[in-house]
Amino acid sequence: MVKEITDATFEQETSEGLVLTDFWATWCGPCRMVAPVLEEIQEERGEALKIVKMDVDENPETPGSFGVMSIPTLLIKKDGEVVETIIGYRPKEELDEVINKYV
């Protein structure tokens, strides 16, 4: 299950392993489209990949620090370092390809 995180918990939740953060908002149509795709990927990948999401309206500090201007923005970190940023909706196959580069 994809976990909701906040500005306060971001560093702790994304500092180890392979982590994909979904920056989203409740009013964002493409964000609602990517949510079930991320749930499916999380279910398939299990412990190999952690997926978290952050509501940009409730938590403006973290997205601002990463220059998030459009949502959804998917930020992939490996052992605390940003390795990839994906902006906008992408189909599952494309997300799997990107994730596979870092597993």
Curated annotation (Swiss-Prot):
GO terms for biological process: cell redox homeostasis. SUPFAM superfamilies: Thioredoxin-like (SSF52833). GO terms for cellular component: cytoplasm; cytosol. The keyword Oxidoreductase applies. Keywords: Disulfide bond, Electron transport, Oxidoreductase, Redox-active center, Transport. Gene3D superfamilies: Glutaredoxin (3.40.30.10). Component of the thioredoxin-thioredoxin reductase system. Participates in various redox reactions through the reversible oxidation of its active center dithiol to a disulfide and catalyzes dithiol-disulfide exchange reactions. This is Thioredoxin. It comes from Listeria monocytogenes serovar 1/2a (strain ATCC BAA-679 / EGD-e). The gene is trxA.
